[in-house]
């Protein structure tokens, strides 16, 4: 099936409702033998390295496996307070600079930063700055880590659709990352302001943030846009867990102009892992 036929078929599906249904199923506490067998089958299908995970019988639900932690010490964090560490395991989708207020999604397709962030004033801070888009496949570790140390100054929740974010969708659905539901975490770091955008996708049941338990789970029926700026920002360390997806999706990093420089070797398709250096001070 070519990309356009695939997307046309997806337009007919109730993607948000489907994602909520799948999410509910992944939170079902099936008997341990059933749960472990399902996890092993999923791992074989997608090539997941189970040696990185705790014993499979510790997961109470399939969803807990999706958002699994890793064994300690498997993802060393690149040292240096001005070195940007990868927040996720995944593949580079695009990197570049925010030009004329827009980011590149794929060849011939771009979209506005203001729509992505749900905040024009916030988007203006990143005009001319570097950005990186990182795609998490179903096989990848699904937790998100802070790329730099600093303070969380606020967040934005933008409800939306739940299109897939696989390469076929990225090539075909215009403005995909500004259409899908997303959670934006805003940081002040040694490299200035940084936004970490967690973009939802089909059958990504929820995106959750660990730094503030009061932030609501995403993908709730009838959700409205929300924003919060902290009177007392939350201190965080580089490599600390920010949150998690319950399936694969996409994370987008944005930086202020003249502050951060990304490694030019980060071409589309290059694999990265949590903690690996993505760049540093401009």
UniProtKB/Swiss-Prot annotation:
Quote the catalytic activity from the record.
a 1,2-diacyl-sn-glycero-3-phospho-L-serine + H(+) = a 1,2-diacyl-sn-glycero-3-phosphoethanolamine + CO2
Note on cofactor: Binds 1 pyruvoyl group covalently per subunit.
Sites of Pyruvic acid (Ser) modification: 249
Q: What is its EC number?
A: 4.1.1.65
Q: In which pathway does it act?
A: Phospholipid metabolism; phosphatidylethanolamine biosynthesis; phosphatidylethanolamine from CDP-diacylglycerol: step 2/2
The organism's superkingdom is given as Bacteria
Q: Which keywords has UniProt assigned to this entry?
A: Cell membrane, Decarboxylase, Lipid biosynthesis, Lipid metabolism, Lyase, Membrane, Phospholipid biosynthesis, Phospholipid metabolism, Pyruvate, Zymogen
Record-marked site positions (Cleavage (non-hydrolytic)): 248-249
The record's Gene Ontology biological-process terms are: phosphatidylethanolamine biosynthetic process
On assembly, the entry states: Heterodimer of a large membrane-associated beta subunit and a small pyruvoyl-containing alpha subunit.
Protein's UniProt name: Phosphatidylserine decarboxylase proenzyme
Q: Which organism is it from?
A: Anaeromyxobacter dehalogenans (strain 2CP-1 / ATCC BAA-258)
């Amino acid at each position: 099936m070519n990309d356009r036929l695939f997307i046309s078929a997806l337009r007919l599906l109730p993607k948000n409702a489907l994602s909520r249904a799948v999410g509910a199923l992944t939170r079902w506490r099936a008997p341990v033998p059933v749960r472990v067998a399902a996890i092993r089958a999923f791992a074989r299908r997608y090539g997941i390295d189970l040696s990185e995970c705790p014993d499979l019988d510790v997961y109470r639900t399939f969803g807990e496996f999706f958002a699994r932690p890793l064994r300690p010490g498997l993802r060393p964090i690149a040292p240096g307070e001005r070195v940007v560490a990868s927040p996720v395991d995944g593949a580079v989708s695009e990197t570049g600079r925010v030009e004329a207020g827009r980011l590149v999604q794929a060849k011939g397709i771009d979209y506005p930063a203001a729509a992505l962030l749900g905040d024009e004033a916030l988007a203006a801070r990143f005009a001319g700055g570097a950005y990186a888009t990182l795609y998490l496949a179903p096989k990848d570790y699904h937790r998100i880590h802070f790329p730099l140390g600093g303070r969380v100054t606020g967040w934005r929740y933008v409800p939306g659709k739940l299109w897939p974010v696989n390469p076929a969708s990225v090539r075909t659905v215009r403005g995909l990352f500004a259409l899908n539901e997303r959670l934006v975490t805003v940081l002040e770091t040694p490299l200035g302001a940084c936004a970490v955008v967690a973009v939802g996708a089909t059958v990504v049941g929820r995106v959750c943030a660990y730094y503030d338990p009061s932030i609501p789970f995403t993908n709730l029926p009838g959700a409205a846009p929300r924003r919060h700026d902290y009177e007392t920002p939350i201190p965080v360390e580089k490599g600390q867990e920010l949150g998690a997806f319950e399936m694969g999706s996409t994370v987008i990093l944005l930086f202020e102009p003249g502050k951060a420089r990304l490694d030019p070797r980060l071409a589309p398709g290059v694999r990265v892992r949590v903690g690996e250096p993505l760049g540093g001070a401009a």
